[in-house]
Regions:
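Residues that line or immediately flank small-molecule/substrate-binding pockets and catalytic motifs
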Residues: 41-42, 77, 152
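Short beta-strand segments and strand-loop junctions that repeat across beta-rich extracellular domains
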Residues: 145-155
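Short, ordered beta-strand-loop transition motifs
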Residues: 1, 74-76
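Short acidic/glycine-enriched loop/turn segments that link adjacent beta-strands
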Residues: 76-78, 157
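Basic, often amphipathic N-terminal segments
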Residues: 1-67, 86-144, 157-168
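Charge-rich, low-complexity N-terminal segments
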Residues: 80-85
């Protein structure tokens, strides 16, 4: 069977570099197999790749880059992430979800809580310590969203299928 497809929102170059740096510093090295990312869909069927690519291309051609903000530092048990607030990005995701309705697994049928994970699969006290440390200097700020990407999930590293940039 071919690998499932993951859809992510791409960050602008400076934000991507910043998030990747934090992820390299705090994610267990043996588990850090992908760059920092904002997941929109976790598991789309590869048999529908032509339709998925076509819909992603249409979305980015029809809309400017959505506004987004880093709004909080989240403690998720054994993980730490930055909350991403973007009603515009969620609206685009909803449009895509409606178009792909019959293809979505239960996890992808629900509206996601957008975030960027920078630490995962650590003991809760380690996550708590990083969360407290990041909260000390955290200030909400804008986050650049530049496009959408599709990847094959390969039991660890992802394989890039393609990137589509928002107009303007």
């Amino acid at each position: 069977m071919t690998a499932p497809i993951i859809i992510t929102a791409d960050m602008g170059k400076a934000d991507q570099a910043w998030a990747n740096g934090l992820r390299r510093a705090h994610f267990p090295a043996e588990r850090n197999r992908v760059d920092a990312h904002i997941t929109l869909f976790h598991h789309l069927p590869p048999s529908h790749l032509p339709e998925i690519k076509s819909r992603l291309a249409a979305l980015v051609q029809n809309y400017p880059a959505p506004a987004a903000d880093l709004s909080d530092v989240m403690l998720l048990g054994k993980a730490v992430a930055f909350r991403v607030d973007s009603p515009e990005l969620l609206s685009l995701r909803d449009e895509l979800a409606d178009a792909l309705r019959g293809l979505l697994i239960p996890q992808d049928q629900a509206t996601p809580k957008l975030h960027i994970t920078i630490q995962n699969k650590v003991e809760p006290p380690v996550a708590k310590a990083l969360h407290a440390h990041l909260l000390e200097s955290f200030r909400p700020r804008p986050l650049a969203i530049s496009g959408l990407s599709a990847h094959y999930y390969r039991d660890g590293p992802w394989e890039l299928i393609g990137r589509w940039s928002f107009r303007g």
